Amino acid sequence: MDGFHATTIFAIRHNGAAAMAGDGQVTFGNAVVMKHTAKKVRRLFHGKVLAGFAGSVADAFTLFEMFEGKLEQFNGNLPRAAVELAKEWRSNKVLRRLEAMLIVMDGQHLLLVSGTGEVIEPDDGMLAIGSGGHYALAAGRALKQYAGASMTAKEIAKAALEIAADICVYTNGHIIVEEL
């Protein structure tokens, strides 16, 4: 039986600001929308870190808890916490089965964390994951390039998700944007 999945998360660093947006759709299998208003972008570590997930909901909550523990352990050092989470995620036989991806960001860093041990910081200050991630990333890049002078990070993040929601059937228009 298929699990709960599907979402789009987009994050951007732009003009000294940072924003992360996520839609609210939770899909069961390929045919049933179970929830429209899920909150997949969260503030962690005293509100100083944003984290968004795509993938299995239960797995993502497990990873959020683990990541928050790593942030506490390393006193908010985002790169170190992300690397340690990725190492544990990849090396533990039980955790290796978790099906989710995370985007995490603070005032200085924007990182993608995956269960294959990858911790990636983008060159262009933008990341997107999930079923509509490619659409959101393309939209975000276009918005930043052609309208970036007149748009904030929050506005670009929201618009990128709106465009992805118009294209991807697993992404809805109930968008939550968090800003640092």
From Swiss-Prot:
EC number: 3.4.25.2
Record Gene3D superfamilies: Glutamine Phosphoribosylpyrophosphate, subunit 1, domain 1
GO-annotated biological processes: proteolysis involved in protein catabolic process
Residue positions of the active site: 7
Keywords, sorted A to Z: Allosteric enzyme, Cytoplasm, Hydrolase, Metal-binding, Protease, Sodium, Threonine protease
Binding site for Na(+): 165, 168, 171
The keyword Protease is annotated on this UniProt entry: yes
GO molecular function, one term: metal ion binding
Regulation (activators, inhibitors): Allosterically activated by HslU binding.
Subcellular location: Cytoplasm
Top EC group: hydrolase
The reaction(s) this protein catalyses: ATP-dependent cleavage of peptide bonds with broad specificity
Assembly, per entry: A double ring-shaped homohexamer of HslV is capped on each side by a ring-shaped HslU homohexamer. The assembly of the HslU/HslV complex is dependent on binding of ATP.
PANTHER family in the record: ATP-DEPENDENT PROTEASE SUBUNIT HSLV, METALLOPROTEASE TLDD
Protein family according to the UniProt entry: Belongs to the peptidase T1B family. HslV subfamily.
Function as written in the Swiss-Prot or TrEMBL entry: Protease subunit of a proteasome-like degradation complex believed to be a general protein degrading machinery.
UniProt name for this protein: ATP-dependent protease subunit HslV
